[in-house]
Amino acid sequence: MQCPYCQHTNSRVLESRSSEGGQSIRRRRECLNCKHRFTTYERIEFVPITVIKHDGKKESFDASKLLRGMVRACEKTGISHQRLETIVDDIEAYLQQRPQREVTTHEIGQLVLKYLREENEVAYIRFASVYGRFKGIKDFVETLDQLQEETISSPMSQWSKSSTRDRDQSQTSPCLSLTHNGSENSR
């Protein structure tokens, strides 16, 4: 490793640590020539993901651009910025694990909608309106109707409608709840 002070190429590692949740290694080094100490980081270099836009143009995947779009859709919905960053990280990790190095904006939009559907219906509609390029009220109404139909027919909504009534009639512990996959989970 080249010393940033004297440009000498020999240094010794004094200390190594895992950082950024195991995604990088931090190394403390000392130059063997000038004795200055400096820090280096070793990170995994991912193969870039190429995004194919609606018009066919291609550009590199930009997680910060995706985050900005989600932040705009989620303003005043109560979803924390940290949660949005986690969602973007999850989407990026999913895309990195795929063997395909190209992804369409449609696929990315579907992934975002899947997450936002679980987080907040208002954020879901806002994002869908931009991503889906809504042209008028009819597009909003169709999406709202579809969202309402999915909510009514989902197992969770059926459980939540009957759970209040059942809880009043039984002696079940209020700490027992259902997770998204329908299995019991105690908090």
From Swiss-Prot:
Molecular function via GO: ATP binding; DNA binding; zinc ion binding
Coiled-coil boundaries: none
The UniProt record lists the keyword Phosphoprotein: no
Bias type Polar residues, positions: 152-162, 170-187
Zinc finger (unnamed): 3-34
Keywords: ATP-binding, DNA-binding, Metal-binding, Nucleotide-binding, Repressor, Transcription, Transcription regulation, Zinc, Zinc-finger
HAMAP family from the UniProt entry: NrdR
NCBIfam families from the UniProt entry: transcriptional regulator NrdR
UniProt name for this protein: Transcriptional repressor NrdR
Originating species: Crocosphaera subtropica (strain ATCC 51142 / BH68) (Cyanothece sp. (strain ATCC 51142))
Gene (name only): nrdR
